[in-house]
UniProtKB/Swiss-Prot annotation:
Gene assigned in the entry: arnA
Function: Bifunctional enzyme that catalyzes the oxidative decarboxylation of UDP-glucuronic acid (UDP-GlcUA) to UDP-4-keto-arabinose (UDP-Ara4O) and the addition of a formyl group to UDP-4-amino-4-deoxy-L-arabinose (UDP-L-Ara4N) to form UDP-L-4-formamido-arabinose (UDP-L-Ara4FN). The modified arabinose is attached to lipid A and is required for resistance to polymyxin and cationic antimicrobial peptides.
Positions bound to UDP-alpha-D-glucuronate: 393, 398, 432-433, 460, 492, 526-535, 613
Similarity section: In the N-terminal section; belongs to the Fmt family. UDP-L-Ara4N formyltransferase subfamily. In the C-terminal section; belongs to the NAD(P)-dependent epimerase/dehydratase family. UDP-glucuronic acid decarboxylase subfamily.
Site residues, Raises pKa of active site His: 140
One Pfam family hit: Formyl_trans_C
InterPro entries xref list: Arna-like_SDR_e, Bifun_polymyxin_resist_ArnA, Epimerase_deHydtase, Formyl_trans_C, Formyl_transf_N, Formyl_transf_N_sf, Formyl_transferase-like_C_sf, Lipid_A_modif_metabolic_enz
Gene Ontology annotations for the cellular component aspect, listed alphabetically: membrane
Binding site for NAD(+): 347, 368-369
Region of interest (Formyltransferase ArnAFT), ranges: 1-304
Coiled coil: none
Protein name: Bifunctional polymyxin resistance protein ArnA
Residues that, per the record, bind (6R)-10-formyltetrahydrofolate: 86-88, 114, 136-140
GO biological process terms, semicolon-separated: lipid A biosynthetic process; lipopolysaccharide biosynthetic process; response to antibiotic
Length: 660
């Protein structure tokens, strides 16, 4: 049976050997070049392929059409993936009549994603395993073909558990590969409600936070012990690594991080104490705990810290350009609620952020991004995270002022992106659901949906393509120059402070604000082309919580990701939105101050937006990336959002001239 194999690591070598032993004909092997910054303790797939006389390749992007075509020419009957680190596109998976199968190092559906070996130890699990499953578009989500359980002993560390998983893999493949070859397998669908997903880990994720229980810190040490980079802490500015440890149920009133004793080297934790059995100071040699204490100059009562002393208390500096806007002011409120952020903001007005102007950790300058370029460059260099939220994002402006949309939304933001590249700063960039354009997918997917727009003579698309091109530029900078980025795509966020009624009076606002103005002034609610277009409306609080988690970036899971932020359950047409808003308006305690409802009026889009407008019939997000990267899902019902948004705007109206 002819196969093409994607493989890396020890598991890749085991998979190749098992396939050959089972009589498979391997036409080609795809692997990775070794990362010089990674300690290579595992077998080389490339060396094994060369020794066995099998063609081997390590392309940067195996999903490129040229590679898809070359793989198609090999006519594989079945495809296997053993610890290959990149997702394989559906075009390749569909090439094999018998299907494609992946080996994953956990008991799926638990611990989907990256580094399951380390994560199960971090989380103190007592059991894991290996799973062979059918490959589908979504990572690690296909039907299970075979599983083998592996017990995790209390003294297991990452390398011993790795060896156990290798042994289990050998057994699993010996039992299963002949059955696949003869088409005699039983597949069991994964239970999505039991699925968990974890992102990649980096060495920086393994710092020891002494306020946590000793058992949690011990599990961290086990999870990243040699040959992994190791768990670490600091004495002042001196970094040291803990290679092995023990938990002591030591009852102590000492502050977490305090040295309780030198021999053995015991450190007070949030619960219990951790004995450092072996460790290493800086880039030195490994030594036992009491010698490490001497090397570090520790005495009883010394304090350890999770970060270098000079930076331990510095707040994360967040630069928000467009801080007075809808997203900017709500995000500022969320960040200042915590005690570890310093917010720097620029905007042309300050009405929405006036409540923060006296906050000690909020720094605001009134200005225009097209003029204050030196201020912006200085603060990009100064800050840790940059959010360029300035954009023209109201549909009527796309046809009314297309060049201004391009100049602000594309040209000005490109300059900021290049500052982030220059100073190696993390950028969180607001893409838009508009980039999907007229995509026909039921759910718009960040990684697979096509981005489809209308012809050039429809200037309505200038906003969409400006944002899309910036998405592609940012992605390219990430791939080629190491820019740390996350793209987020809001789907019709709404809530208090979305535009204002004055903007709505000139047509320069989003849908709900325009509808509220119609109710306030007693003018007909205009339904563009009948108002049948469907959108998924998202409460600003849900959206901001997701954005806050992107900024937090737990485990660096958001790096290099595109994340839709929307509520697929809150789908409604513009007509339905208007009806819900009207019902809420009629029940509001301030209703008697406003004129009678003037009814709905159907108007053509060309008469409202002008020549060159096209609309989109539906726009529903897939939020699988938000689940995976943020552990987030929206919670707030659309009716609650409508009620609160309406209430906010009605209470901003001057009622002195209104009838009572």
């Amino acid at each position: 049976m002819k196969t093409v194999v994607f493989a890396y690591h020890d598991m890749g070598c085991l998979g190749i050997e098992a396939l050959l032993a089972a009589g498979y004909e391997i036409s080609a092997i795809f692997t990775h070049t070794d990362n010089p910054g990674e300690k290579a303790f595992y077998g080389s797939v490339a060396h094994l392929a060369a020794e066995r006389g099998i063609p081997v390749y390590a392309p940067d992007n195996v999903n490129h059409p040229l590679w898809v075509e070359r793989i198609a020419q090999l006519s594989p009957e079945v495809i296997f993936s053993f610890y290959y680190r990149h997702l394989i596109c559906d075009e390749i998976l569909q090439l094999a009549p018998a299907g494609a199968f992946n080996l994953h190092g956990s008991l799926l559906p638990k611990y989907r994603g990256r580094a399951p070996l380390n994560w199960v130890l971090v989380n103190g699990e007592t059991e894991t395993g290996v799973t062979l499953h059918r490959m589908v578009k979504r990572a690690d989500a296909g039907a299970i073909v075979a599983q083998l359980r592996v017990a995790i002993a209390p003294d297991d560390i990452a390398i011993t558990l790795h060896h156990k998983l290798c042994h289990a893999t050998r057994q699993l493949l010996e039992q299963t590969l002949p059955a696949i070859k003869h088409g005699n397998i039983l597949e069991i669908a994964q239970r999505e409600n039991e699925a968990t997903c974890f992102g990649r880990r980096t060495p920086d994720d393994s710092f020891l936070e002494w306020h946590k229980p000793a058992s949690v810190l011990h599990n961290m040490v086990r999870a990243v012990a040699d040959p992994w980079p190791g768990a670490f802490s600091y004495v002042g500015n001196q970094k040291f690594t803990v290679w092995s440890s023990r938990v002591h149920p030591h009852a102590s009133k000492a502050q977490p991080g305090s040295v309780i004793s030198i021999a053995p080297l015991l450190i007070a934790c949030g619960d219990g104490a951790l004995e450092i059995v072996t460790g290493q100071a800086g880039d030195g040699i490994t030594m036992q705990g009491s010698q490490l204490a001497q090397t570090l100059g520790l005495v009883q009562g010394s304090r350890l810290n999770s970060q270098p002393a000079c930076t331990a208390r510095r707040r994360t500096r967040v630069l928000i350009l467009g801080v007075n806007g809808f997203i900017g002011n709500h995000l500022t409120e969320r960040l200042l609620r915590e005690d570890h952020y310093e917010v720097y903001g620029l905007d042309i007005g300050s009405d929405a952020i006036s409540r923060f102007l006296n906050h000690p950790h909020f720094h605001f300058v009134e200005g225009d991004i097209s003029i204050h370029s030196e201020w912006i460059e200085y603060h990009v260099k100064k800050c840790d995270v940059v959010l360029p939220l300035v954009a023209i994002a109201t549909p009527i402006e796309y046809t009314r002022n297309p060049l201004r949309v391009f100049e602000l939304d594309f040209e000005e933001n490109l300059r900021i992106i290049r500052y982030c590249v220059k100073y190696r700063k993390r950028i969180i960039f607001p893409s838009t659901s508009e980039v999907y354009g007229m995509c026909s997918d039921k759910y718009f997917d960040e990684d697979h949906s096509n981005l489809i727009v209308g012809p050039v003579n429809k200037p309505r698309w200038i906003y969409s393509v400006s944002k899309q091109l910036l998405d592609r530029v940012i992605w390219a900078y990430g791939e080629k120059e190491g820019l740390q980025f996350t793209l987020f795509r809001p789907f019709n966020w709404m809530g208090p402070r979305l535009d204002n009624l004055n903007a709505a009076r000139i047509g320069s606002s989003r849908a709900i604000t325009q509808l509220i103005l119609n109710l306030v002034e007693g003018s007909p609610i205009k339904l563009i082309d009948g108002g049948k277009q469907k959108r998924c409306f998202t409460d600003i609080r849900d959206g901001i919580e997701a954005l806050y988690r992107i900024i937090e970036n737990a485990g660096n899971r958001c790096d290099g990701e595109i994340i839709n932020i929307g509520n697929p359950e809150n789908e409604a047409s513009i007509e339905e939105l208007g009806e819900m808003l009207l019902a809420s308006f009629e029940k509001h305690p301030l209703r008697h101050h406003f004129p009678p409802f003037a009814g709905f009026r159907v108007v053509e889009s060309s008469s409202y937006y002008g020549k060159g407008y096209q609309d989109v019939e539906h726009r529903k997000p897939s939020i699988r990336n938000a689940h995976r990267c943020l552990d987030w899902e929206p919670k707030i019902d659309m009716q609650e959002t409508i009620d609160e948004t309406l209430d906010f705007f009605l209470r901003t109206v001057d009622l002195t001239d209104k009838p009572s």
